[in-house]
Amino acid sequence: LNLDYNSEEDFIKKFKIINSLVPISIALFANSSIVEKKNSGYMSYRSKVWQKTSRGGLPEIFFDNMNFEKYSDFAINFPLLFIQNNKEYLSGKNYLFSDFMSGKIKEIDRRLPSETDLATHLSTIFTENRLKKYIELRSMDTCGWDCLCAGPAFNTGILYGNLDETFELISKWDKNKIINAYLEAPKKGFNTELMGKDLLYWSSLLLNLSKKGLENRDVLNKSNENETKFLGHLEKLIDNRVTNADHMIGKFSKNENLNELYDK
């Protein structure tokens, strides 16, 4: 999911919010429990895999009022994955992007990076959220048609319609507890604890903040409906205390035919 910002101050707030909400995003949108025709034991196996990726995760620095300069320092001092040199791809092992900028890479005749090289490098930083010319949110599993617009609507309500109230809420949270909840959420889902409450509680509270934000935006369709209509699926999940992953696990236990299962 890609969202924009209108100033550095706006970016700082939005980036801190979305990183603080990563555990909630994992739990609320968990939908990758079945792996290789088996129950993986995780609500979001996809999130678990990304947590084990050396270039992924939720860096502590992301909670320290990350501004453009700090993110730039983070990105240029991040290891290279590969280098595209003409039509050839070379391993970037043992080099940082700052080495590239300093002309230290002998394998490419010490040439300096282009804007395309920078864009490629930024796209290989697999953190839960990342900055390009926009903010990219990466914590949500994909879902069916009935909830396809729920993720964009949920985050739009929070980040565009109710930014300050949400920022005030998450500013009270401890980053170490957020990171711990992030590590537990792929397996425990709504039962994960954060700041003394489970993620079901926080999901419900944040859904209300999002709903309020979408009402504040008052963007209407041709039928005079506002954007809160897209939150309906999430409201059902929270009311029933189950995730999309729970639904899939329940159906899977009754039907081993995955083709039929996904058709449903």
Predicted stretch roles:
Residues 129-130, 134-226:
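Substrate-recognition/cap regions that form aromatic- and gly/pro-loop-enriched pockets
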Residues 68, 94, 115, 119, ...:
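Alpha-helix initiation and N-capping motif
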Residues 24, 28-31, 128, 161, ...:
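A structural signal for alpha-helix termini and helix-coil/disorder junctions
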Residues 46-57, 182-191, 237-249:
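Short, charged low-complexity intrinsically disordered segments located at boundaries
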Residues 210-264:
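C-terminal amphipathic alpha-helical interaction region
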Residues 13, 20, 27, 73-77, ...:
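Charged/polar, solvent-exposed surface patches and flexible loops
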Residues 2-130:
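Loop-rich catalytic cores of soluble enzymes, especially ATP-dependent carboxylate-amine ligases
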